[in-house]
């Protein structure tokens, strides 16, 4: 919540969840602005018979807002969640088995609105934000085999001698994701009124950068990874940038005792990813909507538009799959074996 508010404290306990939270809005007085703060602690248990599989989250937020000289409205804020779980001490788990999860999210945002209220402009607003999601999981898992198992981890096409997995061992799988996004926008708004017609014009430009700087998916000891497993580095993928321009006009016209609302808009987007075929991908999306409110209970509406959806990050960079074909195998000594595989990466068409 924004604005001046009293202290608000919440305590909640049930068999699965424990929660404590607080919030407060402070008026600094003498037109110095308002500060809002909040905090939260939550512990959620997945299984009542195993409290060690619980997730703990600590959330916080802080924000400042003020209007200078009645024409400049400024806001800035920071929010975050620090969470995770650790089942290492679970006595019900297999000896030595555990899972650790780190889930931290931070977001900073600011905005500046120029409340001009002129004949040619109503307001101009600038927004900017940064989003960071640090998510890391560590699974320490036991494996047991009755016979010797080959393990192919080749990441190039060709013939390779397969490695061998031990009969009994622990393997540590890591998934390290660090999503880091940036965004900024500038919006122009113009509100007008002509007799029985109300007009609202919006136009602006937006930019967003999306990427991941995490180490990705891998095993601490690559030789203990399961057969066919390959690591995947998230930071190896380039950033995806999106720039868009848009304009939208909304009209409200009183027709007798009824109200007719018309909206027309046009949006242009440009997607570019350095070093790829998507360095100059443009889309144009027009749309039109109409609504005729006959009375409180009856309305007629319709619309037309063309939407072109830009590919998401997971569509552009799917997991690389491989085909591993055993071409030779031999057994010798005390039931030991050797295998030769032909590995071939799949190619997207």
Show which residues each predicted segment covers.
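Outer-membrane beta-barrel transmembrane domain signature of Gram-negative proteins
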Residues: 157-262
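Transmembrane beta-strands of outer-membrane beta-barrel pores
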Residues: 11-17, 28, 41-45, 78-86, ...
């Amino acid at each position: 919540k924004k604005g001046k508010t009293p202290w608000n404290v919440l305590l909640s306990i049930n068999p699965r969840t424990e929660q404590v939270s607080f919030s407060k809005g402070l008026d600094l007085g003498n037109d110095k602005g308002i500060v809002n703060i909040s905090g939260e602690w939550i512990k959620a248990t997945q299984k009542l018979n195993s409290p060690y599989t619980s997730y703990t989250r600590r959330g916080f937020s802080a924000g400042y807002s003020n209007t200078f000289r009645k024409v400049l409205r400024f806001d800035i804020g920071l929010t975050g969640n620090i969470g995770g779980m650790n089942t290492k001490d679970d006595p019900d788990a297999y000896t030595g088995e555990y899972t650790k999860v780190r889930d931290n999210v931070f977001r900073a945002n600011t905005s500046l609105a120029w409340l001009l209220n002129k004949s040619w402009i109503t307001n101009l607003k600038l927004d900017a934000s940064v989003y960071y999601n640090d998510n890391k999981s560590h699974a320490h898992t036991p494996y047991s085999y009755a016979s010797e198992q080959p393990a192919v981890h080749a990441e190039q096409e060709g013939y390779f001698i397969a490695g061998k997995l031990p009969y009994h061992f622990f393997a540590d799988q890591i998934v390290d994701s660090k999503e880091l996004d940036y965004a900024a926008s500038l919006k122009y708004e113009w509100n007008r009124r002509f007799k029985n017609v109300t007009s609202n014009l919006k136009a602006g430009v937006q930019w967003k950068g999306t990427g991941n700087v995490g180490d990705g998916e891998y095993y601490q000891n690559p030789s203990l990874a399961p057969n066919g497993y390959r690591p995947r580095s998230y930071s190896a993928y380039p950033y995806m940038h999106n720039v868009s321009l848009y304009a939208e006009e909304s009209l409200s016209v009183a027709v007798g005792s009824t109200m007719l609302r018309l909206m027309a808009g046009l949006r242009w987007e440009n997607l570019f990813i350095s070093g790829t075929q998507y360095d100059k991908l443009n889309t144009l999306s027009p749309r039109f909507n109409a609504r005729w409110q006959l009375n409180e209970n009856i309305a007629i509406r319709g619309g037309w538009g063309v939407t072109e959806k830009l590919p998401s990050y997971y569509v552009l960079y799917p997991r690389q799959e491989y085909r591993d074909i055993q071409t030779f195998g031999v057994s010798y000594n005390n039931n030991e074996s050797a295998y030769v595989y032909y590995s071939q990466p799949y190619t997207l068409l």
